[in-house]
Amino acid sequence: MIRAVYGNIFPLFRLPGERSLPKMSHINVISHRGANIYAPQNTLPAFKKSLEIGVDGFETDIHITKDDKLVLCHNYTIDSTSDGKGSISQMTLDQLKNYDFGSYFSPKFAGTRIPTMEEFLALVETADISVLNIELKSPKKNETAIVSETIRLVKEHGLFEKLIISSFDPKLLVEAKQIDQNCKTGFLYSLNRKTAWSMIRHYVEVAKRLQVDALHPQNIFVNEKYVYEAHEAGLLVNTWTVNLVSDIEKMIRCGVDGIITNYPDVTKGILEKHTY
């Protein structure tokens, strides 16, 4: 009960009686929507803060606008992360750029604008990271466009080798492979999705059917058996959103490949003590 109530407030909360961790090989620390505890999520300041922390990778979310431009935002609307309201798919880029995406978080970030994919990738070009995890949101139209444009822009910026496209929508992952068989993909799933039951029992089979390179499960699905079977099938495991120290340490013990977290600094500190 304590963990359920306070888990997101106290990331350093540790359950009693936890065993120490073995030394492990490298695990990627991937900042979830940037360092979103310190700056507004999915904005350039959040990703710049991630670089200061020294993460191995970025995770972000991409939507397509009414005029077919790619922008970074988690939700389908801008209601909770800006001073505006409305659906991204029903607005042009110029309309979206009129809104403040920083003040809701702190006056310090007043005037922060929604980043375009191009603006984000220009930052990534300067970054010493190895993982560029772009989650594609299912558009109501232009499904092919959001995938093809993402791949085109990433290639244009010379970042294709770092790219892994993830999505809850299998159609987008299949589309990515059809555009370029070398595009790495990861299937996202969580406990509250209709795919949950099949993924509990048949995650390797589903991954093979979708021809993905990685599984991106909510961390509640992950245990040592899960990771072992995924690795035996040649799949990477990047898990999310891992914030509690107890969960971070569990993921280390399980041997995941990447930890997607709101607390990259905390995760990095734990990993530095227990990896080689």
Question: What are the functions of these language-model segments?
Answer:
Residues 1-276:
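Phosphate-group recognition and catalysis centered on beta-loop-alpha active-site segments
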